[in-house]
Amino acid sequence: ATGAMRLAIEIVDSRLPHGSGALAELADGFNNGALVCGPAVAQWQSLAFGQIGIRLHASRGGESSSSELALGSGAAILDGDPFGTVVMLANVPSEPGIGLRAGQIVTTGSCTGAPALPGPGFYRAEFAGLGSVSVRFVA
């Protein structure tokens, strides 16, 4: 069972050179450098995940002036439904002692792609009707 759904920003990063191949990416955690988790979403069970719009904003100066870095929606996720990927993962047969366990965090993939960040600054992802999550990178 899913305990909660949270808004999040996944930071893509790799210890390996670009083009190292699928097995190397698997060994490197699928290029997951960090996960910035925001607030839990109330009443998430009734949401149409594929219809939720997401805007990623970047600000190099102050938080008040920003530009849109990327635009997407939950439809960009496998089969157009981010929660569907969680169900698919939960239904994959696994060896005893391996598989999903209570308390684990599952990311479903990017709704906005993986845009290159212009450098240090304030970044905010807005999830239509649900709220936002933000992160600040410093030099």
Language-model features and meaning:
Residues 1-81, 86, 95, 132-139:
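Catalytic-core "active-site belt" of small-molecule-metabolizing enzymes
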Residues 28-41, 105-124:
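A broadly tuned preference for mixed-charge, low-complexity surface segments
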Residues 85-118:
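A conserved acidic, glycine/proline-rich C-terminal tail/linker
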Residues 115-139:
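Charged, cofactor-coupling segments
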